UniProtKB/Swiss-Prot annotation:
GO biological process: DNA recombination
UniProt xrefs under Gene3D superfamilies: 1.20.5.340
Protein name in UniProt: DNA recombination protein RmuC homolog
UniProt key word Coiled coil: yes
Lineage: Bacteria, Pseudomonadati, Pseudomonadota, Gammaproteobacteria, Pasteurellales
Coiled coil: 3-89
The encoding gene: rmuC
Key words, A-Z: Coiled coil, DNA recombination
Function: Involved in DNA recombination.
The species this protein was found in: Haemophilus influenzae (strain ATCC 51907 / DSM 11121 / KW20 / Rd)
Length: 450
């Protein structure tokens, strides 16, 4: 009995030892399980972060694709405009050439007819007088031709400029990433440096649109308000009819640059909010300056606030969709390079139309002057024809009185036989048969004036 109890105790101890061993293994397994779960959570967090990065890169690629599509559409539109311009100017040049040739031929024919039919009736003095009459008209024709050639040359230059602008648009699309890289140094600089950088980018956009400084826009122009204070808007865009459009380019992007470089999500979100707050502060400052009511300014009741960095503009609107309306309610329109370029190109087209209208008006006035000169030449030719007809009639009357049946020649012919000194021969004096056909001349004048 004692031996059995001892054996049972021994078995119990062995079982207890086994139980302790199994408990230790269980604890180790549980610890290992917790460690694996912790590692799994870390991997899951990293996987989520990687998915967010992939989503961000996908979104960025989509944005770049949309920009490339927009640039391609703009390129297609510019090419279509170029083709239409070439057709228009070619048709204008052809019309001018045809009009010039037709006028030249018609007046040359008119002059040839008059000169051929009446050449024997004109003395040297009459021919000189006719040349004097036709000289102003010839000078007008030459001036008209010179102006047509100038317009054609300017149209060719305009087409070449349009092609250059298309190439510049492509270069802008291809170099957008490089521009973003070059921005880093400016974003980290002082406020003055950043403001100057924004002005440089805005002026490049103005020049890319085909606008000229001190002609289509002014930088840092001086204006006074009603209290006599001085104001210097960054850029004042001149519009036809002496109107203006104001563009501001001094926008602080320090918070945005910090947000881009931050690796912490919460810090990045905080910095983006600070970026939006800086935008709102600048909007409020522009609203208080009230540029549109400055003395000498004829501008719509809003200011364009140019944000030189496209992603800073996009991220701000994504983070705060109501930001654009916030500026709009305060008469401040936020624009980036992409949204500003169509506005600038519209202004450039307005100036081209204004210039075309001015040239068309000048040509119309010149045509009116030429028409009046033609009428004057026709009137003088008509008067000259009447004068020549009168002179011709007087000449024929004198000839009739001299050599007619009852003329002086018949009466003095016998004097030749009475005097030895009468040794000269009486020349033949004929009547002029080529009288000016005034009716026909009037018909020719009317045909050429139509």
């Amino acid at each position: 009995m004692h031996q059995e109890l001892s054996k049972t105790t021994q078995d119990y101890n062995q079982l207890a030892s086994k139980f302790d061993e199994l408990s230790s293994i269980k604890n180790q397994f549980e610890q290992q399980t917790i460690k694996v779960q912790t590692e799994n959570q870390g991997l899951q967090y990293r996987l989520t972060e990687r998915d967010e990065q992939i989503h961000h890169l996908t979104q960025e690629r989509q944005n770049l694709t949309e920009k490339l599509t927009a640039l391609s559409q703009e390129l297609t539109g510019l090419q279509t405009t170029l083709t239409e311009k070439e057709k228009y100017f070619s048709a204008q040049q052809q019309n001018f050439e045809q009009s010039k040739q037709q006028l030249g031929v018609e007046f040359q024919n008119l002059a040839n007819r008059i000169l051929d039919e009446k050449s024997r009736s004109f003395s040297q003095s009459n021919q000189t007088a006719l040349e004097t009459l036709l000289k102003p008209f010839r000078e007008q024709i030459e001036g008209f031709q010179k102006r047509v050639n100038e317009i054609h040359s300017e149209s060719v230059k305009g087409n070449a400029g349009l092609e250059a602008e298309i190439k510049k648009v492509l270069e802008i699309g291809l170099n957008m990433s490089q521009e973003a890289s070059n921005l880093t140094s400016a974003l980290k600089g002082e406020k003055k440096t950043l403001g100057n950088w924004g002005e440089v980018q805005l002026e490049r956009a103005l020049q890319l649109a085909g606008l000229e400084e001190n002609v289509h826009y002014r930088a840092q122009a001086h204006f006074k308000d009603e209290q006599g204070g001085r104001n210097y808007p960054d850029f004042v865009l001149n519009l036809p009819d002496e109107k203006h459009l104001i563009i501001d380019s001094k926008m602080s992007l320090v918070a945005y640059e910090s947000a881009v470089n931050s690796e912490d999500d919460f810090e990045r979100e905080r910095l983006l909010k600070e970026h939006i707050s800086a935008l709102k502060t600048h909007i409020n400052d522009l609203h208080k300056k009230d540029y549109s009511n400055l003395i000498g300014m004829c501008s719509p009741n809003f200011v364009l606030m140019f944000i030189a960095v496209e992603p800073a503009y996009i991220e701000a609107l994504k983070a705060d969709p109501a930001l654009f309306n916030y500026g709009y309610e305060r008469n401040v329109i936020m624009v980036s390079h992409t949204t500003l370029m169509p506005i600038l190109r519209t202004v450039a087209n307005l100036w081209r139309i204004e210039r075309g209208n001015a040239e068309a008006k000048e040509i119309a006035e010149k045509a009116g002057e030429i028409y009046n000169q033609i009428c004057l030449v026709a009137e003088r030719l008509n008067k000259l024809g009447n004068t020549l007809s009168t002179v011709s009639n007087q000449y024929n009357s004198t000839v009739t009185a001299l050599v007619g049946q009852q003329g002086l020649v018949g009466k003095v012919e016998r004097f030749k036989t009475l005097s030895a000194k009468a040794n000269k021969t009486m020349p033949d004096v004929d009547l002029l048969n080529n009288q000016l056909d005034l009716a026909r001349l009037n018909v020719l004048n009317q045909e050429n004036l139509q």
